[in-house]
Amino acid sequence: MDVHHALPLLAGLSPVQFMRRHWQKKPLLVRGAIVDFKPLLSRMELFKLAASHDVESRSIIKNADKWRMKSGPFGPRSLPPTSRPDWTLLVQGVNEHHSGVHQLLQQFRFVPDARLDDVMVSFATPGGGVGPHFDSYDVFLLQASGRRRWKISQQKDLTLQEGVQIGRASCRERV
């Protein structure tokens, strides 16, 4: 990969420019970063991975402004029905189990190996999400289908606070 060549994935920036201007500094929104990007695996394939003991997975369910997380594996009846709103399934390391997702990860090989972990794939019903949280690492978010509102917090104090109600954090919206 020529790290000095501009990439549509990075809004026309080269990997060198991206790493200097944005990596660990500020977010970059790139609409249509991958032309005609579609889901690389079906919902059923994702659910099958979530049922495996060899794959890290978790569900996040929202009930009355409270978020509950459960770790997988998830058998056929251990996830809510897809018709139920307010829940999400997260499956870690999908690139190790699906060749198409592995190929997707190769587009990010400009990131040093020590900072490039894996591909997590999620499925969410309407109203589903992961709840207020912060990541202690940099994240590339690719949305293959559906609609989602993404927010990036301006919060500087990252101390966890027990009992804080959902929606009180000051966030700037990125859609």
What are these regions (language model features)?
Residues 1-21, 35-172:
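Active-site region of the double-stranded beta-helix
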